[in-house]
């Protein structure tokens, strides 16, 4: 019995939504640690800022006046948006002033950008096709940035030879999420979905490789004093 490709694609899409929800929740242990220690230590907010922007764009994309009949897009990304806001609020609460200022600066730029996109699309594009194309292209671009954001942490892992600040759960779920949505995109080939998720698969695999390469070194360091780079060395601008 040959299954309908559309039916298979829908099933993969539902699985993808569930995995995406898991991806949003995967950093939770990191923030539990931050709350317990009342210190963000060397954790960086870059992945959460990137995910915040990505989710906000996809929510906008899924609205009825941009791309009708996209309720699943709105619900999963709306949920993700709320979760990222919670993560950023926790980070802000326990970060030192320089890190707070940096985070607020990036967040302000993102909000201004979102407002500009909304105004430009609603006032300048008057058909669903044009609005969907413009916002969809932005979603692809910033979705790629979301997956690339952990490069900051990967750089830190290599510099410190420690995986302490690269959560394994986040890396694993990112990898699985990328695979799922890449398969979804290939069933009925969609380049807009393939590009960011294909990159997500590759970067997720790279993070897992780094994790297993440096896990023993991280364990050894944790037995003594863990020497971490200064803020200027551990984060990308």
UniProtKB/Swiss-Prot annotation:
Ranges of the Cytoplasmic topological domain: 32-46, 92-102, 154-166, 212-237
MtN3/slv domain span: 11-98, 134-216
Stretches that traverse the bilayer: 11-31, 47-67, 71-91, 103-123, 133-153, 167-187, 191-211
Keywords in alphabetical order: Auxin signaling pathway, Cell membrane, Membrane, Repeat, Sugar transport, Transmembrane, Transmembrane helix, Transport
Topology with respect to the bilayer: Multi-pass membrane protein
Tissue expr: Mainly expressed in the floral organs at the heading stage, and also in stem, root, senescing leaves, stamen, pistil and hull.
Extracellular side: 1-10, 68-70, 124-132, 188-190
GO molecular function: sugar transmembrane transporter activity
Any Gene Ontology biological process: carbohydrate transport
Pfam families in the record: MtN3_slv
Record has Repressor as a keyword: no
KW Transferase (keyword) present: no
InterPro entries in the record: SWEET, SWEET_rpt
Subcellular location: Cell membrane
Principal location: membrane
GO cellular component: membrane; plasma membrane
Subunit details: Forms homooligomers and/or heterooligomers.
Family in the record: Belongs to the SWEET sugar transporter family.
Functional summary from the UniProt entry: Mediates both low-affinity uptake and efflux of sugar across the plasma membrane. Can transport galactose. Prevents growth but promotes senescence. Involved in regulating the crosstalk between sugar and auxin. Regulates negatively the auxin signaling pathway and translocation.
Official protein name in the record: Bidirectional sugar transporter SWEET5
Gene symbol of the encoding locus: SWEET5
